[in-house]
Amino acid sequence: GTYAVANALPGEYPLVKDIKAKVYGAGKGNLADESRIGSVYWNRGLGAAVMWIEGLRNAQKMHNKVGKAVNGAEFRDGYEAINMTEARLNELGVGGMLAPFAISCANHEGAGKFAVMQWDGSKFNQVTGWEAPLDPAFIRGLVESSAAKFAKENNITPKKC
């Protein structure tokens, strides 16, 4: 079968190898089936963690709170300043696992790209590069329409960017 992924590809990326060695190698991991480390599902969680930590780092730098807690508004500022270039992804040890992306006040969607993987009977293999959707304006319209409906139903005033 095939699988389109929009967030993380499976594999033994440098950060995955470091976690295996330093966490699981030291007996501190809690995953019962360690063969799942580096799987598409495990790497989805790792990709999310990388993004949240990058947002936190940004927030701490922006608000002169390095090493200290930030509040929700400060974290949002840091999240909206995420710029995961190919160079930054490589520096973090996840180059190739995620498509490069940037977040802003007006765009929390990320890369907006996907890759197709195919199952070979034992594992998924990437069979395309990171591809853009055929009609990003249509998708953006769906996102904005859904967000406006949610805001109205929940009496939320959307933030102006």
What is each model feature region?
Residues 1-49, 131-135, 145-146, 157-158:
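Extracellular/periplasmic periplasmic-binding protein-like sensory domains
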Residues 33-42, 53-128, 133, 156-160:
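Segments of small-molecule ligand-sensing domains
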Residues 105-111, 136-147:
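A short, hydrophobic/aromatic-rich structural module that often spans a beta strand
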Residues 140-161:
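Short, surface-exposed secondary-structure junctions/capping segments
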